[in-house]
From Swiss-Prot:
Start and end residues of each tr-type G domain: 7-189
GO MF assignments: GTP binding; GTPase activity; ribosome binding
Biological process annotations from GO: positive regulation of translation; translation
One Pfam family this sequence matches: GTP_EFTU_D2
Domain of life: Bacteria
Gene: lepA
EC top class named in words: hydrolase
A cellular component term, taken from the record's GO annotations: plasma membrane
Phylogenetic classification of the source organism: Bacteria, Bacillati, Cyanobacteriota, Cyanophyceae, Oscillatoriophycideae
Name recorded for this polypeptide: Elongation factor 4
Length: 603
């Protein structure tokens, strides 16, 4: 590895919506610069996780260093820092953008700008990045590069007269992209003499070497064997291994300002090396850390329980291992009378929750029951103290609480004009407040609503997709807490409250939710030998109730004569048996019943 001057380094990332061809473009860049040998090349080279490949999304960041000889005959080093495109991971996106000087904005020429792309473009503009628009998939018969270019100009305000037309799949326009990165993306600042500072944009846990930290050197230089300090956590380590990523790790002895690389230093957990933290040298520390570090706060919570109680220890191990890789995941032990022992887990958002659950089931072979997701409520008690509640069964009793506040988000939806009515209806039904509506082009519209997060965490995204036939996209951000008239809805089966089915709902909706839920449970809970009542209650007031009729054996089958007293005797005997069974019998609530809460149509 030759030492490249700072003026010939280019750091860039790719911003694109899911399915607009980001991973394929990254593949082509790696291929054409000869970074990855032809025989090792596979589709979506940078998406390492099976889950990423299957869902076609990028979850964890990757980075790759490419050597490229430009038309001017100079040799350049291009560092591609890949970003996840989903709204749940927007903090990771912002950190990886902070490590770059430029970004390729990849837009599908047959579809146009989507909400997620917009959100990430705004992040890139905040970080003062040079943005190069690329119209991808121009080989498709449905491609309309002119329309999409006009849309980008209209929506983002970028000049698209020079937009590169490309097709990553067919390999068209890839050289133009490489040239424009060299020409347009500014080189990093030459700050070799400053004290060493580097920005962590990703970290993951390796079973043999501990945590591997991916970082971009902002100032100064660092050598193997140096003692480093992480400024946010204050932890200190000695670098055992230093290297660059060409996607595989290649060891080097020194990295300087502008370069991107990785280090290993026998770090035990990812929490010690948080994304966004600043690395400096213990011997000559920097005065202040790089700006922009925040701790990722979980927004959505749910209970995870093993279906088999013997798997509790395995679930604990699996969560510990995932936590090593995922600093945003939080969990604590929880017991439930209905489900036994399990964990209450916190996630960044819905996609994050689904991915964690899938990884637990897939990579650790666990069979899990999940409770309905809930958000963090702020409850002010009568003593004036503020309690954060993320589990409905822990809500203080009505006598002890003064008010409940819930998190609100601002949702921006981009949709073809035809579906505006359907989406407005959806938002109204979820207690949404209309804020703004903008027309981008004649056919595409942005709708802006403020909604309670609790109304979005269950199935809002699925509903959005189904009502717009898959064309709408959404992006959300937290805007703070607001007071609302919220109540706790308890579900009782056979007279016993089932804590895993308890939920916090708005008083106006409580009756409908209670009705819908009891009806749904009536279908899902199997019949028993005795009659099972299912009730929905607020406090001591029952607001909805259903009964599952008993299975009964025909005890009169043997009676042929018309003697009524004989029949009565048998029926009384049966009734007594049922009564005794009801007193001591337990009701099995199947897994589907717990998931029913998610599938409720709040209409």
């Amino acid at each position: 590895m030759t030492d490249v001057p700072v003026s010939r380094i280019r750091n860039f990332s790719i911003i694109a919506h899911i399915d607009h061809g980001k991973s394929t473009l990254a593949d082509r860049l790696l291929q054409i610069t000869g970074t990855v040998a032809q025989r090792e090349m596979k589709e979506q080279f940078l998406d390492n996780m099976d889950l990423e490949r299957e869902r076609g999304i990028t979850i964890k960041l990757q980075a790759a260093r490419m050597d490229y000889t430009a038309k001017d005959g100079q040799k350049y080093v291009l560092n591609l820092i890949d970003t996840p495109g989903h709204v749940d991971f927007s903090y990771e996106v912002s950190r990886s953008l902070a490590a770059c000087e430029g970004a390729l904005l990849v837009v599908d020429a047959s579809q146009g700008v989507e909400a997620q792309t917009l959100a990430n473009v705004y992040l890139a503009l905040e970080n003062n990045l040079e943005i190069i628009p690329v119209l991808n998939k121009i080989d498709l018969p449905s491609a309309e590069p002119e329309r999409v270019a006009a849309e980008i100009e209209e929506v983002v305000g970028l000049d698209c007269s020079e937009a590169i037309r490309a097709s990553a799949k067919a390999g068209i326009g890839i050289n133009d992209i490489l040239e424009s990165i060299v020409q347009l993306v500014p080189p990093p600042q030459d700050t070799l003499e400053e004290p060493f500072r580097a920005l962590i944009f990703d970290s993951y846990y390796d079973a043999y070497r501990g945590v591997i930290v991916y970082f971009r050197v902002m100032d100064g230089r660092v050598k193997k064997g140096d003692k480093i300090r992480f400024m946010a956590s204050g932890k200190e380590f000695v670098i055992d291994e230093l290297g660059i990523l060409s996607p595989q790790q290649v060891q080097v002895n020194e990295l300087h300002a502008g370069e991107v690389g990785y280090l290993a230093a026998a770090i035990k957990t990812v929490a010690d090396a948080r994304v966004g933290d600043t690395i400096t040298l213990t011997a000559k520390p920097a005065q202040e850390p790089l700006p922009g570090y925040t701790e990722a706060k979980p927004m959505v919570f749910c209970g995870l329980f093993p279906t088999d109680a013997d798997q509790y220890a395995d679930l604990k191990d699996a969560l510990e291992k995932l936590k090593l890789n995922d600093a945003a995941l939080s969990y604590e032990p929880e017991t439930s009378s209905a489900m036994g022992f399990g964990f209450r887990c916190g996630f960044l958002g819905l996609l994050h929750m689904e991915i964690v659950q899938e990884r637990l089931e897939r990579e650790y072979n666990l069979d899990l029951i999940t409770t309905a997701p809930s958000v963090v409520y702020q409850v002010t008690t009568t003593d004036g103290e503020i309690v954060e509640v993320d589990n409905p069964s822990l809500l203080p009793s009505p006598q002890k609480r003064e008010k409940i506040e819930e998190p609100y988000i601002q949702v921006e939806m981009i949709t073809p004009e035809t579906y505006v009515g359907a989406l407005m209806e959806l938002c109204q039904s979820r207690r949404g407040v209309f804020k703004d509506m903008r027309y981008f082009t004649k056919t595409r519209t942005a709708l802006i609503y403020e909604l309670p997060l609790a109304e979005v965490v269950t199935d809002f995204f699925d509903q959005l997709k189904s009502r717009s036939r898959g064309y709408a996209s959404m992006e959300y951000q937290l805007i703070g807490y607001r007071e609302n008239e919220l109540v706790k809805l308890d579900i009782m089966v056979n007279g016993d409250p089932v804590d895993a089915l308890a939920m916090i709902v708005h008083r106006d909706k409580a009756y409908y939710v209670g009705r819908a839920l009891t009806e749904k449970l009536k279908e899902l809970i199997p019949r028993h030998q005795f009659k099972v009542p299912i009730q929905a209650a607020i406090g001591s007031k029952i607001i909805a109730s259903e009964h599952i009729p008993a299975l009964r054996k025909d005890v009169l089958a043997k009676c042929y004569g018309g003697d009524i007293s004989r029949k009565k005797k048998l029926l009384d005997k049966q009734a007594k048996g049922k009564k005794r069974m009801k007193a001591i019998g337990t009701v099995d609530v199947p897994q589907e019943a717990f998931m029913a809460v998610l599938k409720l149509d709040p209409q």
